[in-house]
Curated annotation (Swiss-Prot):
InterPro entries: MPC. This is Probable mitochondrial pyruvate carrier 2. The gene is mpc2. The chain crosses the membrane at residues 19-35, 50-66, 72-94. GO terms for molecular function: pyruvate transmembrane transporter activity. Coiled coil: none annotated. It is a multi-pass membrane protein. It is found in: Mitochondrion inner membrane. The lineage of its organism: Eukaryota, Fungi, Dikarya, Ascomycota, Taphrinomycotina. It comes from Schizosaccharomyces pombe (strain 972 / ATCC 24843). It comes from the Eukaryota. Its main location: mitochondrion. Mediates the uptake of pyruvate into mitochondria. Belongs to the mitochondrial pyruvate carrier (MPC) (TC 2.A.105) family. The functional 150 kDa pyruvate import complex is a heteromer of mpc1 and mpc2. GO terms for biological process: mitochondrial pyruvate transmembrane transport.
Length: 118
């Protein structure tokens, strides 16, 4: 029984003898790297990089479910890549919005101090 299941997996059109298996397997490193970047400050993250990862993850997730044979392994890794990218983009945007608010408040305080000094 185990042997038959392994043989079916080994000879599958998206099995380990094909790029359809190894490309998604290697793509998990991008997902893990993105998860590792959760510990980094959004100040040091690239919005373009994570927007690209989010977009490609979403596009290739859909593609993996349309082609024959359906590649659920590829769809899964790309789905998680899109999620990681979206979370990082949202972190970056929140950080940028906070920085603008802090800058605006600082400018208001400076103007207030100048007007009081005059």
């Amino acid at each position: 029984m185990f042997r038959a299941g392994f043989k079916r997996f080994w000879n599958h059109p998206a099995g380990p003898k094909t790029v359809h298996f190894w490309a998604p397997a290697m793509k998990w490193t991008l997902v893990l790297s993105g998860i590792g970047d959760y510990a980094r400050s959004p100040e040091y993250l690239s919005i373009r990089q994570y927007a690209a990862l989010c977009a490609t993850g979403a596009i290739w997730t859909r593609w993996s479910l349309i082609v024959r044979p359906k590649n659920y392994f590829n769809a899964t890794v790309n789905f998680f890549l899109a999620i990681v990218g979206a979370v990082q983009v949202s972190r970056i945007l929140v950080y940028q919005r906070q920085q603008k608010r802090i800058t605006a408040q600082s400018e208001q305080r400076t103007e207030l101090a100048r007007s009081l000094a005059a």
